């Protein structure tokens, strides 16, 4: 499931220039954004949709999903993030 999660985030990064890098191992994945404000917006708006994302190093998002996460949960998060990123271009 970790590879699936990372692949979905890489697909998101390829679609949105605000995402500079996706890195990690297993389910512990980080996403670096081009600006601090993008990270702040993603954290806040994702929380309102029910997804908790940790922000580190000002513009890096750290994902630490529970071990019981399912593909549908990952897909939901990526869909929410996609909509948010479209809105902040």
What is each residue range found by the language model?
Residues 1-89:
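Conserved N-terminal phosphate-binding loop of PLP-dependent enzymes in the Aspartate aminotransferase
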């Amino acid at each position: 499931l970790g590879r699936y999660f990372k692949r979905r985030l890489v697909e998101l990064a390829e679609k949105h220039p605000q995402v500079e890098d996706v890195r990690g191992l297993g389910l512990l994945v980080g996403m670096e954004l081009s600006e601090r404000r993008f990270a702040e917006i993603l954290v806040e708006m994702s929380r309102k949709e029910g997804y908790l994302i940790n922000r580190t190093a000002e513009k890096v998002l750290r994902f630490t999903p529970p071990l019981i996460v399912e593909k549908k949960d990952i897909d939901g998060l990526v869909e929410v993030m996609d909509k948010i990123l479209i809105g902040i271009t």
